[in-house]
């Protein structure tokens, strides 16, 4: 028995089905089936834990409020105590490219509410929930707050955000860095052929908008993959290379390459899978208009695919005589190492 049988003969999901929610940037349901019995619970639990604990994000680390020495103060003309303001600041959702720490400021006069949308951001910081109310000002009141923003993972308590040389008036804030807000999963029975006891894993993921749910799951899976590599203590035996006759084709053999081997974003790859576009030969025959009619497929994904095809000397809207060949799966396997 070859060692490869330990993993090669296990059933694997045909594809990951992604169903976006009302806001595709924040909500999605992902389904993987069929899985070996017990794998639904194993993978669902592992992915959920990593999603909630280990993805990088941005959050407010501390705040300085003009005229305030500590968080147990009150501010003239401001209806909320500083403690309540700090709790509201903790709920600010941010997206930031690059590394921190960075600064952002809010300055406003009353009367009226001060919201996260009033914050003056710099560089690559984006406030994802601008309607979040931070405090309420009476007529004639004024407030100025300066925030320190940083990147990290998981949850960091305010005490850990206080530097040893913190100046008077610096108020540390609990930081929720994780871009993932909620994750739930369920495991159901599913069938494959005549076998009824395989697993179907359904995951529901909600993010703060800094990352899409499908990308979040992809990153979590990559983290698990990287952590598990240390347990693999062997190298797979190399396949024996046999000389075979390669038939002449009426089309570019690169068309036999599967689209899931292209370096595409998770969203673009899933759109192609959901539209049953398996091979590059299927893809290049599509026009731009046809691609844009694909559900959840936008201009950004279109430009990404056009760029990848251009690097191969290909483009959309090509005519491919003799496509698809009758024995496409066999041909694709034979040409796998030749392009």
Swiss-Prot record:
It is an enzyme of class 2 (transferase). Residues 251-339 are annotated as: Alpha C-terminal domain (alpha-CTD). It catalyses: RNA(n) + a ribonucleoside 5'-triphosphate = RNA(n+1) + diphosphate. Residues 1-235 are annotated as: Alpha N-terminal domain (alpha-NTD). GO terms for biological process: DNA-templated transcription. InterPro entries: DNA-dir_RNA_pol_insert, DNA-dir_RNA_pol_RpoA/D/Rpb3, DNA-dir_RpoA, RBP11-like, RNAP_asu_C, RNApol_insert_sf. Coiled coil: none annotated. GO terms for cellular component: cytoplasm; DNA-directed RNA polymerase complex. The keyword Cytoplasm does not apply. One of its GO terms (molecular function) is protein dimerization activity. It comes from the Bacteria. Its EC number is 2.7.7.6. Keywords: DNA-directed RNA polymerase, Nucleotidyltransferase, Transcription, Transferase. Pfam families: RNA_pol_A_bac, RNA_pol_A_CTD, RNA_pol_L. The N-terminal domain is essential for RNAP assembly and basal transcription, whereas the C-terminal domain is involved in interaction with transcriptional regulators and with upstream promoter elements. Homodimer. The RNAP catalytic core consists of 2 alpha, 1 beta, 1 beta' and 1 omega subunit. When a sigma factor is associated with the core the holoenzyme is formed, which can initiate transcription. DNA-dependent RNA polymerase catalyzes the transcription of DNA into RNA using the four ribonucleoside triphosphates as substrates. Belongs to the RNA polymerase alpha chain family. This is DNA-directed RNA polymerase subunit alpha. It comes from Rhodopseudomonas palustris (strain TIE-1). The gene is rpoA.
């Amino acid at each position: 028995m070859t060692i490869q049988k330990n993993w090669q003969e296990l059933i694997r999901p045909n594809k990951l089905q992604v169903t976006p929610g009302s806001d595709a940037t924040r909500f999605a349901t992902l389904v993987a089936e069929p899985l070996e019995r017990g794998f639904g619970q194993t993978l669902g639990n592992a992915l959920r834990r990593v999603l909630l604990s280990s993805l990088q994000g941005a959050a407010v680390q501390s705040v300085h409020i003009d005229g305030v020495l500590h968080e147990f103060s009150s501010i003239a003309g401001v209806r909320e105590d500083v403690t309540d303001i700090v709790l509201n600041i903790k709920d600010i959702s941010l997206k930031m490219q690059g590394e921190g720490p960075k600064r952002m400021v809010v300055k406003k006069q009353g009367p009226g509410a001060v919201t996260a949308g009033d914050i003056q951001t710099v560089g690559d910081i984006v406030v994802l929930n601008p309607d979040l109310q931070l405090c309420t000002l009476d007529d004639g009141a004024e407030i100025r707050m300066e925030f320190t923003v940083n990147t990290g993972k998981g949850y960091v308590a305010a005490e850990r955000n206080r530097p040893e040389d913190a100046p008077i008036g610096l108020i540390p804030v609990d930081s929720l860095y994780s871009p993932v807000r909620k994750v739930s999963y369920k495991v159901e029975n599913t069938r494959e052929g005549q076998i009824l006891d395989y697993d179907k894993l359904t995951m529901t993921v909600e993010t703060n908008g800094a990352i899409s749910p499908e990308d979040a799951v992809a990153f979590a899976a990559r983290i698990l993959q990287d952590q598990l590599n240390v347990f693999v203590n062997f190298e797979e035996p190399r396949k024996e290379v046999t000389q075979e006759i390669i038939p002449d084709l009426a089309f570019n053999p690169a068309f036999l390459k599967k689209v899931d081997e292209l370096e595409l974003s998770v969203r673009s790859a899933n759109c192609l899978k959901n539209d049953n576009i398996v091979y590059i030969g299927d893809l290049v025959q599509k026009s731009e208009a046809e691609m844009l009619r694909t559900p959840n497929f936008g201009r950004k994904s279109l430009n990404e695919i056009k760029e990848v095809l251009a690097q191969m000397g290909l483009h959309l809207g090509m005519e491919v005589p003799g496509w698809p060949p009758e024995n496409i799966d066999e041909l694709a396997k034979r040409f796998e190492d030749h392009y």
